């Protein structure tokens, strides 16, 4: 699907973008991979690792629609990974978060239309479901924009979908690098917000492969959610440092005890497939008569029961401490 195609990744110098680029180069023969981001140092560092002839590096911000549109010329597929994502930072800088996560999302949509992009997938987060913080609220708004964009598309070829998942192992600013840094510094204890806290868990590699698959299975308008394990934060801390004690510091501003990826309010829109769920649009899409119980590959899903929810505390799949370490070690070696 990606052989001979032009692919643009917003926020492409981040953990996801670098892993996505690696997987594309190892498994496909794209014509161009365009890394669109605003940090020149990160682009310089990435270009020294990924220096294939097909690589292109564009300095630009998703807040700048004109620059986005220039970068998207002749692009076939877009992965929108750029976001302001750290919950406390967003709480203290709300308008900056809105400009990047909401206005930036609309700019991506507009640039896709202007350039006749075939498909665009936006990355979302479990925090967008029943949000209690600004980051989650902006990502919910972003999700709504990308789903509704399929109506704006009308008879045009551009289609938009969303991929939502939980905590990514080893991503910048996540809990694993934070804990490992404290351990390396000789800390005698690890800070835990609440012993009851649970989170969804996915490796960078699995996240990338899920997005790649969604390009093939999407009609446009779906929110894709992978079936992934949950973990307790205390189990993660013990797996990384079994001899260290835990210091309870309390939940930070905007945090939840448990994350939700599908709320019971969306159960009437949700289909279960073998390895993932798909939430169909809550609005009728004009000029698109898709049966969301069957994906574009012809695979059939089943409607979930009324009242179904998918949260990190009611998840039937849990990662053991050994599995957590295996995922961490595999991610670091990937």
Curated annotation (Swiss-Prot):
GO terms for molecular function: lyase activity; nucleotide binding. This is UDP-N-acetylglucosamine 4,6-dehydratase (inverting). It comes from Campylobacter jejuni subsp. jejuni serotype O:23/36 (strain 81-176). It catalyses: UDP-N-acetyl-alpha-D-glucosamine = UDP-2-acetamido-2,6-dideoxy-beta-L-arabino-hex-4-ulose + H2O. Its EC number is 4.2.1.115. InterPro entries: NAD(P)-bd_dom_sf, Polysac_CapD-like, Polysaccharide_Synthase-Rel, PseB. Pfam families: Polysacc_synt_2 (PF02719). Its cofactor is NADP(+). The gene is pseB. The keyword Zinc-finger does not apply. NADP(+) binds at residues 13-16, 37-42, 61-62, 81, 85, 123-124, 135, 139, 168-172. Homohexamer. SUPFAM superfamilies: NAD(P)-binding Rossmann-fold domains (SSF51735). Keywords: Lyase, NADP, Nucleotide-binding. It is an enzyme of class 4 (lyase). The active site is at residue 127. Disruption phenotype: Cells are non-motile and non-flagellated and accumulate unglycosylated flagellin intracellularly. Catalyzes the first step in the biosynthesis of pseudaminic acid, a sialic-acid-like sugar that is used to modify flagellin. Has both C6 dehydratase and C5 epimerase activities that result in the production of both UDP-2-acetamido-2,6-dideoxy-beta-L-arabino-4-hexulose and UDP-2-acetamido-2,6-dideoxy-alpha-D-xylo-4-hexulose. Belongs to the polysaccharide synthase family.
């Amino acid at each position: 699907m990606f052989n001979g195609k032009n692919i643009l990744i917003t926020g492409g110098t981040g953990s996801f973008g670098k892993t996505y680029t690696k997987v594309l180069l190892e498994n496909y023969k794209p014509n161009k991979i365009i890394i669109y981001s605003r940090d020149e140092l990160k682009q310089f560092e990435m270009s020294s690792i990924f220096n294939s002839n097909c690589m292109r590096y564009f300095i630009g911000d998703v807040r700048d629609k004109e620059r986005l549109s220039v970068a998207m010329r002749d692009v076939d597929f877009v992965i929108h990974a750029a976001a302001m994502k750290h919950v406390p930072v967003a709480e203290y800088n709300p308008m900056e978060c809105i400009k990047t996560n909401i206005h930036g999302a609309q700019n991506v949509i507009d640039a896709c239309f202007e350039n006749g992009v075939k498909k665009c997938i936006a990355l979302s987060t479990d925090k967008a479901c029943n949000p209690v913080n600004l980051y989650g609220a902006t990502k919910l708004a972003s999700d709504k924009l990308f789903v509704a964009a399929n109506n704006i598309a009308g008879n045009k070829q551009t289609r938009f979908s969303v991929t939502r998942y939980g905590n990514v192992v080893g991503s910048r600013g996540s809990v694993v690098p934070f804990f490992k840094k404290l351990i390396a510094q000789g800390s005698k204890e690890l800070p835990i917000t609440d012993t009851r806290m649970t989170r969804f868990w996915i490796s960078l590699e699995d996240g990338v492969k899920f997005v790649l698959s969604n390009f093939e299975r999407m009609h446009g308008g779906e929110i894709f959610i992978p079936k992934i394990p949950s973990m307790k934060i205390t189990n993660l801390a013990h797996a990384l440092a079994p001899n260290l004690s835990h210091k309870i510091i309390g939940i930070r501003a905007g945090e939840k005890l448990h994350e939700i990826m599908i709320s019971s309010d969306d159960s009437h829109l949700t289909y279960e497939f073998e390895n993932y769920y798909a939430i169909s649009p809550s609005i009728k899409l004009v000029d698109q008569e898709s049966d969301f119980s069957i994906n574009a590959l012809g695979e059939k899903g089943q409607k979930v029961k009324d009242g179904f929810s998918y949260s990190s505390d009611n998840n039937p799949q849990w990662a053991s401490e050994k599995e957590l370490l295996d995922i961490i070690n595999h991610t670091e070696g990937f």
